UniProtKB/Swiss-Prot annotation:
The keyword Glycoprotein does not apply. It comes from Campylobacter curvus (strain 525.92). Its cofactor is dipyrromethane. The porphobilinogen subunits are added to the dipyrromethane group. Monomer. Keywords: Porphyrin biosynthesis, Transferase. CDD domains: PBP2_EcHMBS_like. It catalyses: 4 porphobilinogen + H2O = hydroxymethylbilane + 4 NH4(+). This is Porphobilinogen deaminase. Belongs to the HMBS family.
Amino acid sequence: MKILKIATRKSALALWQSEHIKARLMAQHAGLQVELVGMKTKGDVILDTPLAKIGGKGLFTKELEDSMLSGQTHIAVHSLKDVPVAFLDGLVLAAICSREDVRDAMISQRYVKFDDLPQSAKVGTTSLRRKMQLLRMRPDLNIISLRGNVQTRLRKLKEGEFDAIILAMAGINRLNLADEVAHIYPFDIAQMTPAMGQGALGVEAVDDAQILEKIKFLNDERSVIETRVERDFVTLLEGGCQVPIGINARLASEEIEINAIVGLPDGSEVITENLTAKKSEFESVGKELAREFIARGAKELLKRAEEMANL
């Protein structure tokens, strides 16, 4: 293979991610040419509707997957938190790269800390997971749907539409945005549990031995273990990328620390768990935790959450 083609969304963050993988591939494989093929996904085009109301899985991945299945491209680079837990026939999750900062952060032009936000402050996010946890901490907040790429969200913040917005620290760091805003307040994981796979890049590829061989060096053992726990948890709960589920696993030596939360978008009802498991249990602990949540009513709670989101 002389040319490897990467399917990519056209946002600044998506292009950064694809360029990052392109550079690593070319450094690893002398003589390999790598091209980016830009395209728009459903999630990029429909910007006037909250993601949960658009419905379906793979809002930011389907068009990229179609291009791989048609032979137009060979791989796609995603924020792993946007990658569905099930793959179409002929496609595989070929690599999980080393993780960036997994935390969510409050970005504001006026308020330094989350506790500084005034009563009924306007906070922008389209994520039901973030909304759930924000309202659990501060039921008075006015959570407003905020769509668009990172630059669009920052512009709306600076124009005064919001008192604060919520972004992933990984995106802030990758795009070097710290100097563009006045205040960044990263949430503790116990305050705001991240989405599955948050902070990691996932490389999806056609199920072709030659291509998979070129990609496998990108795998990071720690990230593979952590995200396996997280994705197993979400898979068993049958939760997509747009439901209020937070799950984070952190490998520390021979132990895995896990935080998980499932609940209603308004934060009025939640199921939570914090635990420590052995590293050797990483292939089972995510499923076991999901079964515990199901026994505690998580599936019924998620069904109600979906109904609330579609009102």
